[in-house]
Amino acid sequence: MKHIATLLFSLALFSVAANADDKPIDFQQLPSSAKTFIKSEFPMESISFIMKDSDLLDTTYDVHFASGLKIEFGSNGEWKEISRTSSPVEIRFVPKQIVSTVSSRWPGAEFKKIERYRHGYEVELTNRLELKFDKKFRLTEIDD
């Protein structure tokens, strides 16, 4: 019985892995709201490449820019994550309440990454802290 369960689990895992598909795409293949966001918020940025990641449950789009900026969009075209490798993320994308909490508790820290989830936000700071906030922008977790 254990062997059958192990076999079924292995087949299910293989099936999920086989359905995962990362492929490069053109700008025109992005959802329209993602294209609009990029054109309005980052008109001077040069796109290096775009990857479409399709799996069993979701599709995401990773847009990589020459400057080190990376934006991940969900299947609906709304941004899910904004990060930069060489400079801070612009605070205009970070809710004011989160900016206020960070600037009062960690003066001088800047944002390297912001992720937006259904249940809240996660930010990574230049001082290497990772912070989680709930929907009401309350700090719920600190990871150093």
What are these regions (language model features)?
Residues 1-24, 38:
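Bacterial Sec-dependent N-terminal signal peptides
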